[in-house]
């Protein structure tokens, strides 16, 4: 299926955001470390339909024959010698790192306005100004370049000469590893832990995994750091369970930072590029690490979905919660709920305002549901929150068939968006409000047309810059029953 005109415009504008085409149109003048801050194997369940979160990257089947095309802009041919990142050209991750933050936001705003032009014209509204890190587009004054906002960091490992263990990032377009002494967009201290893991593996002669020959043991490491807490969790991904000097290695990893509360081992012996396998065990410390969002506490297990940029996550969630306009006695359905973060934050916010609601969370991954139930208990919401391990589409179809009551529906689907069946059932349920958080505005734009055709009007759509210096934008849409 060919791209729509709006999709082509959005893709072109996103590429301009990263390559700096607007810079070329304008004047050529340009004006602690924080201590790097956790249980069961990731559940596996087959759904009858696509449309529910499967993994941390929200990968899922798409409902359309045309796959989603994420535009990957080419890296700049030259790197500013004053660049804050010494490997920017080789890495290619932060393609707009050297571009003024205000211009990054302006380009993303243009892309979203072009993408949603037909919807906004249909509803007589405009796209809200993009919410950046610490600033909203249009604010007066300076727009400081965001740094240290990624609270999850990862590295692949590869064998080097004479038993060396190489770590860092894959060079752009290849699987060659580029060493990374420090990454300016990761929370300070995270990269030192990852590099330290490589050094300990070398010392104990634990061989890195060779993906071409499918030999070796150490494949990846993932570090997650708390934002409101100082807790750190490390997940070591190995090709098999048994390692030489295993206990010494695990203890050495735990000693790399005093705030490490959990070290987990994930076993992934399958070929391919997927980081995580299906078996996870705790080899040091607690089963989970803990963090906070919007005043709620969350236990995070090694394979749980949890946003990488918690500062912007709070903003994203608050926009959705405000759009829900929860009333006394409302039933809130949180579809694709993961570990329950959005629904629990909304329920807690209502509770703090003296508003009693009932929360129903739906997530296909049983491990995510286990986390959500534990998090409901952590936040004193066990009497008003229920979580089901089920496919979101199946669940909402059953609810519609049984004419069940849902007053507010929260949707946060994977990159492929929702399914036609889910959206049709959502309209049949007739919730008063729908909030739709999207990590892929292209598929969200498609889905919103179906919701509007099903009896809803679009009240507002707000872009959020979750990942500065990249072409990625997330959006929150608020809809109301006509």
Set out the residue ranges of the language-model regions:
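Short edge beta-strands and adjacent turn/loop segments
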Residues: 214-228
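Short beta-strand elements
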Residues: 148-171, 223-225, 281, 287-293, ...
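Nucleotide donor/acceptor-binding cores
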Residues: 151, 230-232, 329-330
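Extended interfacial segments that mediate partner engagement and assembly in macromolecular machines
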Residues: 78-82, 89-208, 228, 243
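Solvent-exposed residues in well-ordered beta-strands and their adjoining turns
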Residues: 156-158, 224, 237-239, 480-482
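Rossmann-like S-adenosyl-L-methionine
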Residues: 3-29, 35-38, 42-43, 47-59, ...
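Short, aliphatic-rich beta-strand segments
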Residues: 223, 230-239, 297-301
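Short, acidic/hydrophobic/Gly-rich beta-strand patch recurrent on exposed beta strands
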Residues: 168-171, 237, 372
């Amino acid at each position: 299926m060919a791209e729509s005109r709006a999709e082509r415009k959005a893709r072109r504008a996103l590429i301009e955001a990263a390559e700096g085409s607007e810079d070329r149109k304008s004047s050529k003048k340009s004006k602690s470390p924080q201590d790097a801050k956790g249980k069961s194997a990731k559940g596996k369940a087959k759904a009858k339909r696509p449309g529910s979160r499967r993994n941390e990257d929200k990968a899922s089947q798409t409902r359309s024959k045309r796959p989603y095309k994420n535009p990957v802009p080419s890296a700049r041919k030259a790197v500013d010698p004053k660049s804050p990142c010494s490997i920017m050209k080789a890495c290619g991750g932060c393609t707009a790192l050297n571009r003024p933050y205000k211009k990054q936001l302006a380009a993303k705003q243009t892309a979203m306005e072009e993408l949603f032009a037909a919807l906004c014209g249909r509803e007589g509204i405009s796209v809200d100004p993009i919410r950046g890190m610490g600033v909203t587009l249009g604010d007066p004054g300076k727009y400081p370049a965001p740094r240290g906002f990624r609270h999850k960091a990862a590295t692949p490992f590869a064998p080097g000469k004479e038993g060396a263990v190489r770590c860092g990032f894959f060079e752009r377009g290849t699987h060659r590893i580029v060493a990374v002494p420090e990454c300016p967009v990761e929370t300070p201290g995270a990269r030192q832990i990852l590099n330290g893991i490589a050094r300990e593996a070398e010392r104990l002669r634990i061989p890195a995994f060779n993906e071409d020959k499918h030999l070796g043991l150490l494949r990846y490491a993932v570090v997650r750091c708390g934002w409101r807490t100082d807790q750190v969790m490390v997940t070591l991904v190995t090709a098999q369970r048994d390692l030489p000097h295993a206990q010494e290695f695990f203890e050495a990893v735990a000693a790399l930072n005093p705030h490490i509360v959990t070290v987990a081992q994930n076993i992934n012996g399958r070929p391919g590029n997927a980081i995580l396998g299906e078996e996870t065990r705790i080899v040091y410390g607690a089963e989970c690490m803990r963090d906070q969002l919007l005043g709620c506490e969350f236990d995070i297990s090694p394979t749980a979905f949890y946003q990488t940029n918690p500062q912007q996550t709070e903003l994203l969630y608050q926009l959705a919660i405000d759009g829900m306009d929860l009333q006394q006695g409302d039933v809130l359905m949180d579809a694709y709920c993961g570990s329950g973060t959005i629904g629990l934050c909304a329920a807690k916010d209502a509770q703090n305002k003296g508003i009693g609601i009932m929360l129903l969370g739906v997530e296909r991954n049983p491990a995510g549901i286990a986390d959500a139930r534990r998090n409901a208990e952590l936040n004193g919401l066990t009497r008003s929150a229920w979580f089901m391990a089920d496919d979101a589409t199946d669940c909402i179809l059953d609810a519609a068939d049984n004419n069940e009551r849902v007053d507010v529906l929260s949707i946060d689907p994977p990159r492929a968006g929702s399914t036609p069946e889910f959206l049709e059932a959502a309209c049949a349920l007739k919730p008063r409000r729908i909030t739709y958080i999207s990590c892929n505005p292209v598929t969200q734009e498609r889905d919103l047309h179906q919701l509007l055709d099903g009896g809803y009007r679009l009240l507002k759509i707000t872009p959020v810059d979750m990942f500065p210096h990249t072409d990625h934008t997330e959006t929150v849409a608020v809809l109301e029953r006509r």
